[in-house]
Swiss-Prot record:
This is Dephospho-CoA kinase. InterPro entries: Depp_CoAkinase (IPR001977), P-loop_NTPase (IPR027417). The gene is coaE. Its EC number is 2.7.1.24. ATP binds at G12, M13, G14, K15, S16, T17. Pathway: Cofactor biosynthesis; coenzyme A biosynthesis; CoA from (R)-pantothenate: step 5/5. It comes from Ruegeria pomeroyi (strain ATCC 700808 / DSM 15171 / DSS-3) (Silicibacter pomeroyi). Pfam families: CoaE. Residues 4-197 form the DPCK domain. It comes from the Bacteria. One of its GO terms (cellular component) is cytoplasm. One of its GO terms (biological process) is coenzyme A biosynthetic process.
Length: 197
């Protein structure tokens, strides 16, 4: 019996690091952001439909995320058109992974799991969490966005407290050792049959 575990959490909470910990425990991982990256890359399934809808968004035969951000900033309605192209392709990618993976636990790393209703396809959901001030400090330390951009992203996401309240597991990512211990405990519980698919 394959167990489907959704992994979610807001920006800067340590989701990618936590996802790798599940892989270290023998779980198979599907990463929504990586799937979009594949679709946007040269030869990816999203390139042709995006070129048809937004010709300027395709640069060197790949979809340019910076150009897409600019398009969305200029025309907020463009986001719905982009999602209408990308979401079905992401769903196909996820289904291919689900149907071909051989691990007993499949982890689906999906930042907007609850926002998109994806939890319905999961047997359980784990949410990563740290206090808001630590979240902000982590994101700012990356040096990849301004404080205003961070606040804009955070405003679009469901509050992390709500994500945690709706999840079966909350993984506090204050330290690597603490996070790893929680991941190992979740995997143990699932494999022992304490959490049913």
């Amino acid at each position: 019996m394959t167990f489907r575990l959704g992994l979610t959490g807001s920006i800067g909470m340590g989701k990618s690091t936590t996802a790798q910990m599940f892989v270290d425990e023998g779980c198979a991982l599907w990463d929504a952001d990586a799937a979009v990256h594949r679709l946007y890359s040269s030869g990816g399934a999203a390139v042709a439909p995006m070129r048809a809808a937004f010709p300027d968004a395709v640069v060197d035969d790949a979809v340019s995320r910076p150009v897409l951000k600019h398009i969305i900033a200029e025309d907020p309605q463009a986001l719905k058109r982009i999602e209408a192209i990308v979401h079905p392709l992401v769903a196909e990618d996820r289904a291919r992974f689900r149907d071909s993976a051989t691990a007993d636990i499949l982890v689906f790393d999906i930042p907007l799991l609850f926002e998109t209703g994806g939890e319905a396809a999961m047997d359980a959901v784990a949410c990563v969490s740290i206090p808001p001030e630590e979240q902000k400090a982590r994101v700012m330390a990356r040096g990849t966005m301004t404080e205003a951009q961070f606040e804009q992203i955070r405003a679009k996401q469901m509050p992390n407290e709500e994500k945690c309240a709706r999840s079966d597991f909350v993984i506090v990512t204050d330290t690597l050792d603490h996070a790893r211990a929680q991941v190992q405990d979740i995997v143990r519980q699932i494999r022992a049959g304490n959490i049913h698919a």
